[in-house]
Amino acid sequence: MQKMTVLAALLSCSALFSAAQANEGAHWGYEGEIAPANWGHLSSEYATCATGKNQAPVDIQSTVKAKLPALPFHYQAGGNAIINNGHTIQVAYAEGSQLTIDGLPFTLKQFHFHAPSENLIQGKQYPLEVHLVHGDPQGNLAVVGLMFEEGKANPLLTTLWQQMAQQVGSQLTLSKSVNVADLLPHDRSYYRFAGSLTTPPCTENVRWLVLKKPMTASKAQIEQFAKLMGHPNNRPVQPLGARQIVE
């Protein structure tokens, strides 16, 4: 039941992901007294942000070599609304797009952005990262992370940024549903680790899959997102502890 409550609160389009937690619990953010270092002390609901042992994001360095199965993305055009929840820009996704992990179907609920990246790869921080958030009927969560490096403009980002909600709390219907598969690289090799949500309540037992190959976004696209946020919206990397990262 607790998993289902978290899934409903964090992934429902009407809940607006992070905004729901801000409304239902203590206000949190990325600067000052409500910055990531203090999240665990803002509310008892956020205690895991401070006490959790399997927190995300992480710096992906030492890894264990394994024969990870290919990720079977079954995505279709379903991104239909763009939301500015004050913490990120999020695109709500209609039902029907799935990713199978460990033999289980996870439905894509939404995707959102962080600048700079939250996860690091070999100590490198990218200027932008997108998180594709999935859930299953039992309330389990899986997040695919994809990095962007500065380069050519990304066509899908162009479409999204042209319709980006400017006011906090605003939601706009996209003129045409987008397919997040258009963001994915051809090389979909990845790292896998056990982690958490990177925002309060920092719920753990999240399957994390970080793609190795970055895509590109133009300097103007990166700056446009950063300007709208007004400040970095990334949680610092968390201790890896006893966890292993598999590739």
What are these regions (language model features)?
Residues 8-15:
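Bacterial N-terminal signal peptides
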Residues 4, 20-247:
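Alpha-carbonic anhydrase
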Residues 1-8:
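Bacterial N-terminal signal peptides that target proteins for export
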